[in-house]
């Protein structure tokens, strides 16, 4: 997969000059033949099959994030002008460290005895060896630079370069995960488990104390023991952090975290009125209440389901608000406050968020059950809750 990678890094410009920033240009070649390499080979591997051109760093953000952050599409020069010196320096250091890691991997791979069948394993072993001893020294800009390199490889439709960089990223994440508390490790495992039944089985084994298990493909998997309440609370904390931002950077991850929180709470067996699930809200969020009122006013069916799907995907009432706070324009804005009245807080509420919406549905259901109110409304809300989870399942995996 990887024969040689030659990396160049431009001279480090000062943030004030904002000269062209070049992250490591990678010259990748992947032409291993079936013949083995001799351990004591004296010549360096020189054949270069694919040249991956240099590219400028735009900050490691997607086009949507760049628009949110700078109010412009991905214009490289403008983005660099907007970067503050600390962020600019972090990018430089991160890029240099990616270069260093890949160079050290080459050193290990050059003298390895391998054939075409074992090259993928060899790359993974080299990544484990190099990153394992350097993970504690990783710069804050390392993952930002690596993510941007992967984005560009994907845009260039360069699967080999993308695959190599993803091996490095997965290895780094794996090492970082091992340093996390057990309930955080479990969330990482659940995010990579697409089948609902498998997630439930994983949660059961985690609640039982964890241990070593054999997966369907025969590989050994170590599952840590953790408290279900800790898992639900951690997922909820991550959700709150993501949902209070003006724009959601990754809706797929957001949907996975919502499912993890709801499934962990459901497995605790305390029901809707379980005090462990109480966030301590004194009032419910305006946007979610307005949207829920619309859904309850309509008969359950395809129309309501489509409304839920649109909002969960970030459309209609769930669309991210990228306008500035001081924008006086009222065109296209939805009314603030409950039922179109003025906002109680005087601030424009956030759009409808998946995690907060399900939290709102649960709170309203809890009030209905504790007050012995009409059963028809409760059934309607249960249906909304169920359909929302189905939609999030489709988005998440």
UniProtKB/Swiss-Prot annotation:
Residues 315-334 have a biased composition (Basic and acidic residues). GO terms for biological process: chloroplast organization; regulation of DNA-templated transcription. This is Protein PEP-RELATED DEVELOPMENT ARRESTED 1, chloroplastic. Induction: Induced by light. Highly expressed in young leaves, shoots and flowers. Expressed at low levels in stems and siliques. Residues 315-351 are annotated as: Disordered. Residues 1-52 form a transit peptide. The keyword tRNA-binding does not apply. It comes from Arabidopsis thaliana (Mouse-ear cress). Plays an essential role in early steps of chloroplast development. May be involved in the redox control of plastid gene expression by maintening the redox state around chloroplast nucleoids. May positively regulate plastid-encoded RNA polymerase (PEP) activity, through binding to FSD2. Disruption phenotype: Seedling lethality due to deficiency in chloroplast development. GO terms for cellular component: chloroplast nucleoid. Its main location: plastid. InterPro entries: PRDA1. It is found in: Plastid, Chloroplast stroma, Chloroplast nucleoid. Interacts with FSD2 and MRL7.
């Amino acid at each position: 997969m990887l024969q040689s990678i030659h990396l160049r890094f431009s001279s480090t410009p000062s943030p004030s000059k904002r000269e062209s920033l070049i992250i490591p240009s990678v010259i990748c070649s992947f032409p291993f033949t079936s013949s083995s390499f001799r351990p004591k080979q004296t010549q360096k591997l020189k054949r270069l099959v694919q040249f991956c051109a240099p590219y400028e760093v735009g900050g490691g953000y997607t086009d949507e994030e760049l628009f949110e952050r700078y109010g412009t599409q991905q214009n490289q020069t403008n983005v660099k002008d907007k970067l503050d010196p600390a962020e600019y320096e972090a990018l430089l250091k991160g890029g240099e460290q990616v270069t260093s890691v890949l160079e050290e991997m080459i050193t290990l791979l050059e003298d390895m005895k391998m054939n075409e069948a074992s090259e993928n394993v060899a790359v993974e072993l080299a990544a484990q060896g190099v990153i394992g001893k350097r993970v504690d020294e990783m710069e804050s800009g390392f993952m930002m630079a690596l993510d941007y390199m992967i984005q560009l490889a994907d845009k260039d439709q360069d699967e080999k370069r993308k695959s190599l960089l993803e091996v490095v990223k997965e290895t780094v994440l794996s090492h970082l995960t091992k340093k996390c508390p057990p309930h955080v490790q479990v969330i990482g495992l659940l995010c990579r488990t697409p089948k609902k039944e498998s997630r439930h089985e994983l949660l059961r084994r985690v609640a039982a104390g964890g241990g070593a298990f054999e997966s369907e493909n025969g590989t050994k998997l170590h599952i840590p023991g953790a408290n279900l309440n800790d898992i639900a609370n951690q997922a909820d904390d991550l959700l709150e952090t993501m949902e209070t931002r003006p724009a959601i950077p990754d809706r797929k991850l957001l949907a996975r975290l919502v499912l993890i929180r709801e499934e962990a709470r459901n497995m605790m067996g305390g029901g809707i009125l379980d005090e462990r699930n109480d966030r301590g809200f004194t009032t419910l969020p305006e946007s979610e209440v307005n949207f829920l009122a619309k859904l309850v006013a309509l008969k359950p069916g395809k129309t309501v389901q489509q409304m839920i799907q649109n909002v969960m995907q970030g459309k209609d009432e769930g669309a991210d608000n990228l306008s500035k706070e001081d924008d006086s324009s009222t065109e296209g804005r939805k009314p603030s406050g409950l039922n179109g009245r003025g906002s109680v807080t005087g601030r424009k509420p956030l759009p409808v968020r998946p995690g907060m919406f399900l939290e709102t549905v649960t709170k309203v259901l809890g009030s209905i059950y504790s007050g012995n109110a009409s059963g028809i409304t409760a059934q309607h809300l249960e249906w909304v809750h169920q359909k929302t989870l189905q939609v999030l399942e489709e988005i998440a995996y």
